[in-house]
Amino acid sequence: MTVNGKDIDSPNAQYVAAGIDMSDLFPAPFPTNVKTVHLETLSLAKLLQRDEDELRRIYENCKDPGFFQLDLTDDEQGVQLLQDAVDCARLMKQLLPNMSVEEKRMYKQHSRVGVYSKGYQVYDVLPNGQPKYNETVNFPMTEMLGYGDSTVDLPDWLSPHRELFQRTMRSGNKIANIVLAALEVGLQVPRGALTDAHRIQDPSDDFLRLLRYPGLQPGQPRDDLCFPAHKDFTSLGILFTWLGGLQLLASASAPGVTSGTMTGPLDIAEDAWRWVQPVPGTAIVNVGNALEILTNKALTSGLHRVVRAPGEQLPFDRYSVLVGTRPANSFPMKPLQSPQISPVLDPAAAEIATMTSGQWGTHNIGSFNNWVKARTERQEVLIIP
């Protein structure tokens, strides 16, 4: 196979999609002896065409399990986002392992508490200076695109790539709104009920997040849990990843599962978890808590976690690109009116219904900080057989 004038040998041909060679992001094959979850693959082109069967399928998959794979290769808008995500991952692969944490921390987080949409972030650092679990680089969409009251000053190691980050954000917001418009049909809400809450020009806590999960090195203490089980504080997440690590539950009714948004690493039995195998050319899309709230649980925000890569992939760094979409900060967090959405609110939902999206996000991130601190104090360690 020849891609852009370069010969691609047959083993790597499986990592080529829409003419984009991603073989460098797949340094080892996904193992064949682990239990995986089946996610439906939906077509971006068919969603744009308002194909009735595809509209039904996306609604059913967002009801349960709240995850699906979106084929981006059949529409030029999707191919653009795919290429931008690959470019972002390659950039982080070039930069992050070769810089000190002190250098990377020069990209400061937001001064306001409760928002993880800006800056470099790492929780635990090993004696060799490398992150123990993961490191993230976050870009706030509103400020990056010039829609807010302030702009983002990027450090020297990021500023030459501002246009790439901006392009990825714009493409991601377009794709998210295609998904939201499709869900409006299944939910039987007026056109614009969801998309008007997620307009790119309205101030929000939308973000682009670039992640690196360092591979396990010889002699390093084994702890397989990179990020404990949780639900996302978004409306939609659009995730690109190339190595294994993301896990979902085989059943939402597994022992230990609660209605909460977070849980400890040892609360749910190991055999309840299933691996997600990345598929070249697709993005993994998930419903977040905001969409679950706006539909009063007609749509499901699925519990998931991130662990170290399986099998031969274990020693390799894993990179991910995540576009997070949230309602505008001023949007009320009360359920939409529809025959598909129950008007009866439980006490927690009734309290949230008095908040704006911005207030709700700040409240949730504060709880998340306490959860992370408690996990560290308990010194919980997970080792997957």
UniProtKB/Swiss-Prot annotation:
GO molecular function term, any single one: 2-oxoglutarate-dependent dioxygenase activity
Residues engaged in binding 2-oxoglutarate: R318
EC numbers on record: 1.14.11.-
Family label: Belongs to the iron/ascorbate-dependent oxidoreductase family.
Alphabetic keyword roster: Dioxygenase, Iron, Metal-binding, Oxidoreductase
PANTHER family named among the record's database cross-references: 2-OXOGLUTARATE (2OG) AND FE(II)-DEPENDENT OXYGENASE SUPERFAMILY PROTEIN-RELATED
Cofactor remark: Binds 1 Fe(2+) ion per subunit.
Keyword Ligase listed: no
Name of the protein in question: 2-oxoglutarate-dependent dioxygenase AFUA_1G01000
Domain Fe2OG dioxygenase: 203-327
PROSITE patterns attached to this UniProt entry: FE2OG_OXY
Organism: Aspergillus fumigatus (strain ATCC MYA-4609 / CBS 101355 / FGSC A1100 / Af293) (Neosartorya fumigata)
Enzyme class, UniProt record, top EC level: oxidoreductase
Xref: InterPro entries: IPNS-like_FE2OG_OXY, IPNS-like_sf, Iron_ascorbate_oxido_reductase, Oxoglu/Fe-dep_dioxygenase_dom
Induction of its expression: Expression is up-regulated during co-cultivation of A.fumigatus with Streptomyces rapamycinicus that triggersthe production of the polyketide fumigermin during the bacterial-fungal interaction.
UniProt KW Manganese keyword: no
Function, in words: 2-oxoglutarate-dependent dioxygenase; part of the gene cluster that mediates the biosynthesis of fumigermin that inhibits germination of spores of the inducing S.rapamycinicus, and thus helps the fungus to defend resources in the shared habitat against a bacterial competitor. The partially reducing polyketide synthase fngA alone is sufficient for the production of fumigermin. FgnA catalyzes the condensation of 3 malonyl-CoA units to an acetyl-CoA starter, and 3 methylations to yield fumigermin.
Cofactor entry: Fe(2+)
Ligand binding (Fe cation): H230, D232, H304
Domain of life (superkingdom): Eukaryota
Gene3D superfamilies assigned: B-lactam Antibiotic, Isopenicillin N Synthase, Chain (2.60.120.330)
